[in-house]
């Protein structure tokens, strides 16, 4: 598989992982790190961009579609967002809860600047941690 196609696959997987659809972006990232198809920072940046754009898509959807309070998680996430604001989006990488946080950030009309900054930072830190653990593991085994 060419490097460009591999990077597109990682981007698409990361984008889908930021929605409620399964994307398994961490598995794809680790596989690409192990294959050595591209520099680790290129892979981390690609995964971060895809996942961040997916998260921002959820924020946009939250702005357009009204949400009804129906679940305990939604009430808890709304409380976090009211208390801590956009900083809560550092947790946007978490499965299901992160998707809900992004939707609620849009629904609550939190300012774009802080939303973009904290959402991207949270997602980047996750991929940096996965890549660092993988690279360290590779060095340990060799």
Swiss-Prot record:
Q: Sorted alphabetically, which keywords does the UniProt record give? A: Cell inner membrane, Cell membrane, Membrane, Transmembrane, Transmembrane helix
Note whether ATP-binding occurs among the keywords.
no
What membrane topology does the annotation report for this chain?
Multi-pass membrane protein
Subcellular localization, per the record? Cell inner membrane
Where are the Cytoplasmic topological domains? 1-2, 48-86
Determine the domain of life of the protein's source: Bacteria
Q: Which residues are exposed on the Periplasmic face of the membrane?
A: 24-26, 108-142
Q: Which GO terms describe its biological process?
A: bacterial-type flagellum-dependent swarming motility
Q: Which residues cross the membrane?
A: 3-23, 27-47, 87-107
Keyword Transmembrane helix in record:
yes
Q: What is its main location?
A: membrane
Pfam families documented for this protein:
VTT_dom (PF09335)
User: What are the record's GO terms for cellular component?
Assistant: plasma membrane
Q: Record's family?
A: To H.influenzae HI_0489.
Listed name of the protein: Inner membrane protein YqaA
Q: What organism is the protein native to?
A: Escherichia coli (strain K12)
Q: Which gene encodes it?
A: yqaA
């Amino acid at each position: 598989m060419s490097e460009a196609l591999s990077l597109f696959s990682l981007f698409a997987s990361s984008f889908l992982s930021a929605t409620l659809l399964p994307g398994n972006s961490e598995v794809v990232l680790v596989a690409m790190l192990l294959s050595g198809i591209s520099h680790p920072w290129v892979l981390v940046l690609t995964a971060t961009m895809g996942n961040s754009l997916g998260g921002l898509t959820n924020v946009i959807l939250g702005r357009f579609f009204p949400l009804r309070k129906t679940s305990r998680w939604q009430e808890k996430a709304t409380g976090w967002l009211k208390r801590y604001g956009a900083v809560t989006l550092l947790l946007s990488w978490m499965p299901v809860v992160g998707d809900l946080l992004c939707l609620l950030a849009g629904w609550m009309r939190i300012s774009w600047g802080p939303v973009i900054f904290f959402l991207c930072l949270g997602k980047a830190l996750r991929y940096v941690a996965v890549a660092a653990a993988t690279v360290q593991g590779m060095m340990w085994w060799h």
